[in-house]
């Protein structure tokens, strides 16, 4: 029997989606399909063609297709969802949640129809609630629906620590629990530089400053750009997750996972350390938390549930 080429479909051809498609192609993880709405089919095809024409120079052998038709996504191994709208001035949180939940449902129906065995990674904000929506709509098992936030937050944290210590980012490890921004729970006790606990290398006030900058990381970039938000680091984070699944790497990564009793919580998607491999989220890693970490995580859970309360009722 012929060996099937791997396929990764990216839904949403904006800055993050297009950059994700390019990074997946550069890693030669499989053929790439970039999908957007019919009104954006021209630009989507143009971006995909531009990427495809770069492959001979980069020495990667993949097909890259731009389309508005989900037919091209048939039998995808992994589907990455970046589609959705950003919050606009005057838009309420409930409006944002409701609108993006509607988009998630429409996209998920197409994914289930054309790729019933796919693993789905969700980036669309608010990511915890949107991942939950995709999980419920798809009917897929929890290990095959995964959200992205912690990989990005951890990458930012590692970057800032490496800059502070003037060390290679490769030697910096760290973890965060919970959601993005102020809801992030930094696990400094599990953060190291070359195997040395961070607390042995930096004074507490510098660690606190790095944590705060990490929490505000997305906002810092928004402020500098003036229009738009981060997309290189989010795309790199998504590509890392796709690679972990397709290569069955058994990576220990913080992802948005469905909890069924872990950490004492039920029926919620939230950021926790996981083992990510060929069967998606293969395990949620439960860490012993201090009372302070438990309290901060509980606050993060409360915030996620608050956002989920704005999801349209069935």
Curated annotation (Swiss-Prot):
Enzyme class: oxidoreductase
Binding site for NAD(+): 12-17, 36, 100, 123-125
Pfam families in the record: Ldh_1_C, Ldh_1_N
EC numbers: 1.1.1.37
Keyword terms, alphabetized: NAD, Oxidoreductase, Phosphoprotein, Tricarboxylic acid cycle
Keyword set includes NAD: yes
Reactions performed catalytically: (S)-malate + NAD(+) = oxaloacetate + NADH + H(+)
Biological process per Gene Ontology, one example term: lactate metabolic process
Gene Ontology molecular function: any one: L-malate dehydrogenase (NAD+) activity
Coiled coil segments of this chain: none
Binding site for substrate: 87, 93, 125, 156
Top-level lineage group: Bacteria
Post-translational modification Phosphoserine, affected residues: 149
InterPro entries given in the database record: L-lactate/malate_DH, Lactate/malate_DH_C, Lactate/malate_DH_N, Lactate_DH/Glyco_Ohase_4_C, Malate_DH_type3, NAD(P)-bd_dom_sf
Cell cycle keyword on record: no
UniProt-annotated catalytic positions: 180
UniProt family annotation: Belongs to the LDH/MDH superfamily. MDH type 3 family.
Protein role: Catalyzes the reversible oxidation of malate to oxaloacetate.
HAMAP family: Malate_dehydrog_3
Protein name from the UniProt record: Malate dehydrogenase
